[in-house]
């Protein structure tokens, strides 16, 4: 499925409703250039979960949001240079958590160990002043 958004607000509103019911157990991998909308798209999912303050974990690498029955992991691998480094921040344990929703920005390093049966891929592109998102999964 390919979607086009003319504004960040429209992208957030779409992603807020698209992920209902909540996709517990899914691993979302978000690829695309800097500023192409990956974090903005995830803001909608975060709003659906009731998370009002949502930022990219570029420097912490992993943000964890705890809920009663599950966790939401937001992972940003932009600054991670190897699979070993991903493992050092608990990456393998996170990927094995079936009672969670996991979103990984800049996922290239970890793709070889992401369980394919749980994978949902999103590819973002800047087109003019808007954004195009290709969804697979």
UniProtKB/Swiss-Prot annotation:
Q: What is this protein called?
A: tRNA threonylcarbamoyladenosine biosynthesis protein TsaE
- Positions with a binding annotation for ATP: 8, 35-40
User: What coarse category fits the chief subcellular location reported for this protein?
Assistant: cytoplasm
Please provide one cellular component term from the Gene Ontology annotations of this protein.
cytoplasm
Which GO biological process annotations does it have? tRNA threonylcarbamoyladenosine modification
Subcellular locations according to the entry = Cytoplasm
Taxonomic lineage is: Bacteria, Pseudomonadati, Spirochaetota, Spirochaetia, Spirochaetales
Report the protein's function. Required for the formation of a threonylcarbamoyl group on adenosine at position 37 (t(6)A37) in tRNAs that read codons beginning with adenine. Is involved in the transfer of the threonylcarbamoyl moiety of threonylcarbamoyl-AMP (TC-AMP) to the N6 group of A37, together with TsaD and TsaB. TsaE seems to play an indirect role in the t(6)A biosynthesis pathway, possibly in regulating the core enzymatic function of TsaD.
* GO MF annotations, alphabetized: ATP binding; metal ion binding
The record's keywords, sorted A to Z, are: ATP-binding, Cytoplasm, Magnesium, Metal-binding, Nucleotide-binding, tRNA processing
A family per Pfam = TsaE
InterPro entries on file:
P-loop_NTPase, T6A_TsaE
| UniProt-annotated binding residues for Mg(2+) | 39, 105
Similarity comment text for this entry: Belongs to the TsaE family.
| Gene3D superfamilies xrefs | P-loop containing nucleotide triphosphate hydrolases
């Amino acid at each position: 499925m390919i979607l086009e958004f003319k504004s960040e607000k429209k992208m957030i509103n779409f992603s807020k409703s698209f992920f209902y019911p909540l996709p517990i157990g899914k691993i979302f991998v978000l690829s695309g250039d800097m500023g192409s909308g990956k974090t903005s798209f995830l803001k909608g999912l975060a709003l659906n979960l009731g998370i009002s303050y949502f930022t990219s974990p570029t420097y912490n690498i992993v943000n964890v949001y705890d809920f009663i029955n599950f966790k939401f992991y937001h992972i940003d691998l932009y600054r991670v240079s190897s699979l070993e480094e991903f493992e050092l921040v608990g990456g393998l344990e996170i990927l094995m958590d079936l009672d969670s929703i996991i979103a990984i920005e800049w996922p290239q390093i970890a793709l070889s160990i992401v369980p394919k049966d749980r994978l949902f891929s999103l590819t973002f592109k800047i087109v003019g002043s808007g954004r195009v998102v290709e969804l697979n999964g």
